[in-house]
């Protein structure tokens, strides 16, 4: 082969999987492989799959099928690869199937099918690695796996128990990213607030001090690097209360992504989730008293087996009181291997849809009410996209792709990644509108 070997890559699923894809691509680029924009222009295709829900598995199978049709040489990795039988049955011609985080196995499969053109040269890639996100923000994965055993979830089966990175390893990566121009670090894992439990909060050397592998300590150190720090996938352990002070001080963004999943004590017990939602409401109230700018994002499941009309009504009432700023909702799907499949009294599909519609309608009103309070205020906005007359950005209350946006007019040209102060002039159900202040 006279040219460098070319790889096409499809990455599906959550931000954790996206980080896995970035690591694989970084290693391949260091070995001289080039990235092709289309499958039919590549020598081989890698598909990083999602296997959490049946709908995600179908999307993964469709992506594998497209790669097989357009190229024919396909390596499959990711969460669905942890249970390869369905892939093998549908596409027996794939070259290799591996589970999540098996970077070396993916590289070995690539080497067997498409040897590198030359010896590795690490200077082919920037020191912070290859990123699949825009230049101004990056996902920072601090651990793998999860020690919780929620009945609807098979992530521990796919990704194993919690394995945290040493604090100095995380901080070195974060510092490289900020040095390369990243303005926002999105801290992710399966269970961000459990960070360091497996390490027994061991210290590691960083700069002129020792830093514990602990949620609060890591958040504090990340906040000293000069970028926005956004905490996502936070399980509501009691020690989460401690990080609110960092938000009040401006060390990290006043934003918490906590997947509460439900509010009814009976449903939460069936899910094996924290069930004292009356105490959670009291905590939310304290958090907002301490940090009035705090934005809360959460996800909820409707139609969980055994969920009654009373359980769902309890959830709606709880949402009215909690006033979650940003909300995602899923209709329950039975997942192969999940213990929730054995719970009695499954909810009919039409009832799931009715409850989904009702919850999202309720949340739309809550969101509109909370956003309306921001009209007339000044907010810091990070610019994601620049158009001819209007730029699209996000406030500190908005994570990329999953939350709302802020649409801005400006008398001067704006740049992607720039952080500006804007006056908020109008709000709708999910988004804000305004203009860059001072011009």
Swiss-Prot record:
HAMAP family: MTTase_RimO (MF_01865)
Ranges for domain MTTase N-terminal: 5-115
Binding locations of [4Fe-4S] cluster 2: 146, 150, 153
Protein name: Ribosomal protein uS12 methylthiotransferase RimO
Cofactor: [4Fe-4S] cluster
Top-level taxonomic group: Bacteria
Residues reported to bind [4Fe-4S] cluster 1: 14, 50, 79
Species this protein is from: Bradyrhizobium diazoefficiens (strain JCM 10833 / BCRC 13528 / IAM 13628 / NBRC 14792 / USDA 110)
Family matches, as Pfam families: Radical_SAM, TRAM_2, UPF0004
Domain TRAM, first and last residues per copy: 372-438
Record keyword S-adenosyl-L-methionine present: yes
GO terms under cellular component: cytosol
Keyword terms, alphabetized: 4Fe-4S, Cytoplasm, Iron, Iron-sulfur, Metal-binding, S-adenosyl-L-methionine, Transferase
EC code: 2.8.4.4
Cofactor, free-text remark: Binds 2 [4Fe-4S] clusters. One cluster is coordinated with 3 cysteines and an exchangeable S-adenosyl-L-methionine.
Function of the protein: Catalyzes the methylthiolation of an aspartic acid residue of ribosomal protein uS12.
Predominant subcellular localization, coarse grouping: cytoplasm
SUPFAM superfamilies: Radical SAM enzymes
Locations listed in the record: Cytoplasm
Any single biological process term in GO: tRNA modification
Domain Radical SAM core: 132-369
Top-level taxonomy: Bacteria, Pseudomonadati, Pseudomonadota, Alphaproteobacteria, Hyphomicrobiales
GO molecular function (one): metal ion binding
Family stated for the protein in its record: Belongs to the methylthiotransferase family. RimO subfamily.
